[in-house]
Amino acid sequence: MSWKLKKKAQALVSSEEGVVRKEWGGRVSIALVYPNTYAVGMSNLGFQTIYDHLNALPHVVCERVFFPDPEDLDEHGRTATPPFSLESQRPLTDFDLIGFSITYEGDYINSVRLLRMAGIPVRAAERGPADPVVMMGGVCAFSNPEPMAAFMDFVVVGEGEEVVSEIVDAWIGSEPAAEGERRRRFIDRLKPLTGIYVPDAYRVGYGPGDLIAEVAPLAPDVPRVVMKRRLQDVNRFETRSVLKTPKAEYGHMELLEVGKGCGRGCRFCLEGQVYRPVRHRSLESLRESVARIAKGSKRVGLVGACVSDYPWIGDLMRVLEEHGVEVSISSLRADSLTEDLVASLQRGGHRTLTMAPEAGTERLRGVVRKAITDEQLYEACDLLRRYGIPNLKCYFMIGLPTETREDVEAIPELAARLLERLQVLGPDGHPFGKLTLSVSSFVPKPWTPFQWAPFDDPRALEDKLDLIKRAARRLDTIRVVHENPREAALQALLARGDRRVADFIELAAGLEGDWRRALREWDGDAAFFTRRSRQAAEILPWDHFDVGVKKAGLLREWERARESVAPAAAAV
């Protein structure tokens, strides 16, 4: 093992507050893997929550593993150092169970790279009795885990707070077992659990046009449809940062979840669908959390699909102020922005507020079911100016269904009007206040009304970005940031693919993550998964899951969107 890498890991752990170290003797050992860098993974509240819940079990030792920083990859290769845990610097092969927490489809390739680096067979079918059991959780696991199915012994479908202890109990209950039998007995004990998907227990058949013909269980005790695991009582588990480190993307700011789900029903939004029903933590529960946070931190970031819709947001802001805690909110809806809320943010030191109009015209906002008017956006700017919050960040998407050139041109035009309402004069007589446009390429996601829509042509998306950037250059205080449309195309492939995409993922992992080259060498057809409209009667790769959203309701919303109709109620 590289002493340089080991020393870096020890330095990271020594800079943390809240790290758990346990003796291994007699305990179930679990490697909790975030397949991205330490800074990204430590900013993920779900990852921290599962780490906390597992280590709260006395018979478990859970340690973290991250994908190496770019500057460390060469050192891993040069010294043949496999991925290892932060807490004890043990290699992945030493653990009983390996759990990948996957939030972004782009991390699929990193996950397989880590298995390769560890010397663990990447395909579940190739692992033997001496290999760790490999599982996957996170939002990608219950949107569409099929591209990763070949690599996983099992998948946690849904919210993991309760099911992790049941997984541990199943592992303990599979002992004693005959030589080589424990893995099979463990998987058999998992199959009846709600929220557990064992890919190897299903056969996928393909028919004419390479479409899925059926997904069938291979045994009578295997459910035909895998039900999502849903946390019934969000107050039962406190969801806040348990590990603090200056190396995370958010630095010393603690994160606090106010609830799960969103009732708005935006037609493009995965999170608003798969985390239903909406569940808010009680004000009293959050009050207790804030009191604990305030003992060690003075900055907190509120986390939720739509924080400004929290029913007691005004009361919560007052609780935070009473404890002298500065608050950050990732994004706010213009139609739920109040004077009291903006005033609280200003007192908390906010310099930038973020909103997500998503589209440049009210027509297209109606199509995507983001019912925010231009006037509401202007009024939000007036509030920011009145309370001295100078900067605004707005999220927009291009490539949305029914989008026209006029919709794209409207983005910088709307931005100019927002900037005009936002800016005030500084002491030198010049306007201060900046507007950032964050423009992303729309990726149709499973479990949304837009799951039948095609992904736009990357070249067309690049042209649209050029149009927006050229128009924005005329305004000095507007900045445009965006992702590469070809990276969005990769995300579309991984989000919408089926089990056949595993070959591409494994190929890219073998090419050290060079997915562009992998796309050229793969014998599959990426456009089949990305650029093709799906038919209403088509079996989708994720149809053998039930996340609480009815396909018929999503289809009705898709038809209404194409008719540019936005009803008052969300699809259920």
Residue ranges and their predicted role:
Residues 47-49, 115, 149-152, 171-172, ...:
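Short secondary-structure boundary/capping segments
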Residues 268-285:
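Iron-sulfur (Fe-S) cluster-binding segments and ferredoxin-like electron-carrier domains
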Residues 32-33, 106, 288-393, 397-436:
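Conserved SAM/AdoMet-binding glycine-rich loop
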Residues 67-218, 446-498, 505-511:
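Glycine-rich beta-alpha loop elements in corrinoid/cobalamin-binding modules
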Residues 1-22, 26, 30-32, 465, ...:
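Radical SAM enzyme core and accessory elements
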Residues 32-36, 54, 242-268, 351, ...:
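N-terminal pre-triad scaffold of radical SAM enzymes
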Residues 2-31, 38-39, 205-255:
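N-terminal [4Fe-4S]-dependent radical SAM core
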Residues 71, 203-207, 264, 311, ...:
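Flexible glycine/acidic-rich beta-alpha junction loops that bind and position SAM and/or redox cofactors
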